[in-house]
Structures are given as C-alpha cells and as structure tokens.
C-alpha cells in the first residue's frame, strides 16, 4: 500500500451526522429569529465551516452569525453530537488499515473538542492516531487542519491521502499537497461527475470500495 497515513473527513465521511446537525441548525435559526431551513439548506450545513453557511447561504450579518453559531453549539453539545452514527463498515475499515501499519486520523471542520467527543463515543478505542478539527472561532482552513494532522502524525505528504465527501475536502487536500479520494455516500458529492474538476485519485460509494481502492494503490 502506497499510503502510510490516511486522513478522513468526519461529517458525511466517517459518520452520518445529519440528524444532529439538522436539529442544531433549526434550533439556531429559531433562536436568531430566522425562518426554518428547507431540505437543500440543511444539507448544505453538513461539512463546511459554520461561518460560511450562515453568512453565504443564510445571508446573516457577522453579528447574527456569531449568535447563530453560539446557539448551534449550545444544542449540538447537549444533544446533536450524540445523534451521529458511523457509516456501515467504517470501524472495520479503520481497524484493517491499522493492522496493516497505516496511521489513521481525522481532519474536520467540526470543532476539535466536538470531534473528539463524537469519535470517542462512536468508535472503538485506538481507532484514531490523531483527531484535528476547527478552532472555536472557525478560522482554520481545511488545508491548515490537514497539515496539523500530518505534522502530529509525523507523516510524509507524498504518503498521505485525505478521504472526504465535499469540494471543501478536495480543495483542502490540494492546498495541503496530499492526494484525495472522494466519497459519494455523504452530503456532498453524489456521483463521479460531481467530483470532476477537483483533483482526486478515485471515487468510492461505500467503505468496501475505499478499502479496495487503498489496497491497489
């Protein structure tokens, strides 16, 4: 296997976090006096940084965005975080990689303390060698998060791959100088066509396909 380090995005890649994220979004919109989100807007919240979705997609001011993020995190920390569930076969995939000597980590836009709590409650102990996420102010780019994970792992970029479900992941991998595998079972890419235009070495529809692709690279 070419890769000595495999990094996963979290939302829409490691775990289906939609139920908790959707509930937190609706709570935050209600608390800030906005109309409920429709299905398309809810889906857009899974993966990207919260500052992006509230400002660019909801049209909020900076002050409104700050209040919305506070409300989102209030609900998410109490309830939404624990509504998540790993995708079928994900724990088994990770453990098989670990048995082959691969170092496994997470690089997510989710706040790092939330990511650690979620993964610690949903995956067996020892699955992840590093968990890197966003800072509380949501100022880190995906590339910076990826690079922080690589640095902590002591990995070489040429032997590292990021797996994710959105163009944010693809762009972050490219900016960080690592390979990228797109997945179509999350909330971003829905098919191979969606991943066109972004550097990637493969497109996978489930965990079995991820494992098979990594084995032949």
Language model features: what each stretch is:
Residues 161-202:
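Acidic, Mg2+-coordinating phosphoryl-transfer loop and its flanking beta/alpha structural elements
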Residues 2-92, 100, 113:
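N-terminal helical cap/lid subdomain that shapes the substrate entry/recognition surface
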Residues 109, 135, 166, 184-187, ...:
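Short secondary-structure boundary segments
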Residues 30-32, 52-62, 83, 91, ...:
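Substrate-recognition/cap helix-loop segment adjacent to the acidic, metal-dependent catalytic center
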Residues 210-217:
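Short amphipathic alpha-helix with an adjacent loop that forms part of the alpha/beta core around
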């Amino acid at each position: 296997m070419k890769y000595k380090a495999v990094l996963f995005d979290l939302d829409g890649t490691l775990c289906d976090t939609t139920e908790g994220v959707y509930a937190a979004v609706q709570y935050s919109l209600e608390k800030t006096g906005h109309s409920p989100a429709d299905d398309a807007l809810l889906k857009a919240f899974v993966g990207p940084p919260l500052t992006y979705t509230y400002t660019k997609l909801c049209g909020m001011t900076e002050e409104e965005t700050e209040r919305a993020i506070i409300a989102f995190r209030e609900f998410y920390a109490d309830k939404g975080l624990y509504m998540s569930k790993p995708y079928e076969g994900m724990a088994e995939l990770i453990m098989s990689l670990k048995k082959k000597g691969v170092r496994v980590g997470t690089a997510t836009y989710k706040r790092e303390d939330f990511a650690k709590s979620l993964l610690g409650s949903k995956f067996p102990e020892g699955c992840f060698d590093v968990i890197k996420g966003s800072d509380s102010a949501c100022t880190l780019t995906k590339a910076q998060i990826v690079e922080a994970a690589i640095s902590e792992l002591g990995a070489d970029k040429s032997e590292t791959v990021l797996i994710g479900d959105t163009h944010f992941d693809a762009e972050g991998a490219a900016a960080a100088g690592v390979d990228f595998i797109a997945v179509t079972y999350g909330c971003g890419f829905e098919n191979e066509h969606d991943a066109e235009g972004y550097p990637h070495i493969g497109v996978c529809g489930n965990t079995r396909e991820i494992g098979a692709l990594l084995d032949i690279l």
